[in-house]
Amino acid sequence: MKKLIFLAVCLLASGMPAFAQTYQELCDRAVTYTEQDSLPQAETYIRRALKLEPANPHNALLFSNLGTIQRRQRKYEKALESYNFALNIAPRAVPILLNRATIYMELGRNNLAQADYSLVLDLEKDNEEALLMRAYIYMQQRDYKMAKADYERLLKVNPTSYNGRLGLATLEQREGKYEEALRLLNTMIAAKGENRQLSPSQYAMLYVARAGVEKDLHHTDMALVDLEEAISLDS
């Protein structure tokens, strides 16, 4: 999840003493370089701001932004360190917890990611990203009961969630509940003409998913038709 939270630091400038203006200017330069995708320069200015005012309470945001910039440069261990520093300052900051969980997932540390998603859900019980990703982790662990609980909770919060419905269909398939998986996928595909928010690639994924269920049911001809439709949509 990409969250750059360059925010309240800049909003308080008018009420801060003159020495803090330099801190804000450094933050502003970091924002500018980030928007220009000049990430090494943005990182340099954030580090200068952190060095200038190491006790500034807004440094949680700067460390979080630094982590996101490092992640975009594939410096995953450094990004993790930055998110840890941010959470040392603001341990209940949901966006930062979600960012760290994403890094853990990219590093293959799913158990640690799961802990962060669970903490997020303790703070925000209906957080969609945390529900979706924890359900995915449970499914990888073959804890299908817990995965289903998270998918169903997600769909109560957002009944039209594409990833939630597709995830639940995949879960039903893994449990051998092929007819239920087909029902979910058929419903999503049937709304193709009505739902214009989904891209052709997203619809192609639905046809691929349905082809997988049809293959499990030994309906090879139907699976091939769906795969051809998926290729057509994604071309």
Language-model-derived ranges and their functions:
Residues E35-Q36, I69-R72, E106-L107, Q140-Q141, ...:
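Register position in tetratricopeptide repeats
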Residues L61-N65, N99, M133-Y136, G167, ...:
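Canonical tetratricopeptide repeat
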Residues Y23-Q24, P57-L61, V94-P95, E128-E129, ...:
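Helix-start (N-cap) detector for alpha-helical repeat units in TPR-like alpha-solenoids
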